[in-house]
Amino acid sequence: MNTLSVLKGKRALWLLAAVVLTAIVTYIIEEFGLSAISLFEGGLLSMTPYALTAVGECINEKSGVVNIGLEGILAITAVTGVYGAELFDNGFLGLLVGALTGGFMGFVFGLVSVYGKADQTVAGTGINIFSIGFVQYLLMSIWGFPGIHILERRLMVRPIYTPIGQISIVTIFAIIVAGLAHVLLYKTVLGFRIRAAGESPQAVDVAGVRVDRIRTLSSTLGGALCGLGGAFMSLCWMGGVVKEISAGKGFIALACVVFAGLEPLLALAAALIFGFTGVFAFSVAVTPGVKEIIPFYFVNMVPYISTLIVVTIAIGRRRFPKASGVPYRRE
């Protein structure tokens, strides 16, 4: 059996699995009287922070920098996004503040890991731990309450109406960004340098290109997209901020990255899967006749269980850059 036959066989299996899954989901929707439009809208909302964060991290890791501090960046930028919206009296400017905050955090992470040669796992973990206390500090110092802050409805970034439901402008932007990231990485000189910095930084250095600058730029861009995802959660989705607003979304985004093998378009597809899985499970859990049987907290575990399964299956089958997570030292 040649390689082409194997690929065709795998595609047929994936197509069959997709058809079966679609049939099961359709049956459950009809059986429990769920709204397909509501599931669609909720799935896109849930998908957006995953997609933005995962696509940004794909670019980052292609350059050889691994940032596991996405959870902390999402939490902090969710707060700064709301603060920016109230400060400038504009939700879109709040999104910009969130993106800039995330970009700054990515830049600092780049300085620490690229120029400081710090262990990237430790640095990313530090961001996550730092965010736990810093988010509460921001909530208390800005609004005088450490747990929650509700945003005025007029400052929320409203979705646009389409024939298939309401869709956020940021969601559309996230889909476009995934395509642009693919073009950047595979169709431009900068993208070639980013990929080369992750595969063979010595060769890039010999060619006269600064590896440290390429990696820092990638880290900054990844942080900015993650920051936009954090601001999206508070300004476009939840209408406010709580101290646990990220709730593991940064780690799920990392699972999307692993599943995709650092490919932006596959990361977008993974984000769609995780987003719709969580919303679908929640919708079924609150349906009369089901919520009395299945504990609500058990259903809340579904996205995280699916994350563990996906990472376990995918991590051994994906190829990552040879210099991934390894600081480059010029000889």
What are these model-derived regions, one by one?
Residues M1-L52, T80:
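Membrane-interfacial amphipathic/re-entrant helices at transmembrane-helix boundaries
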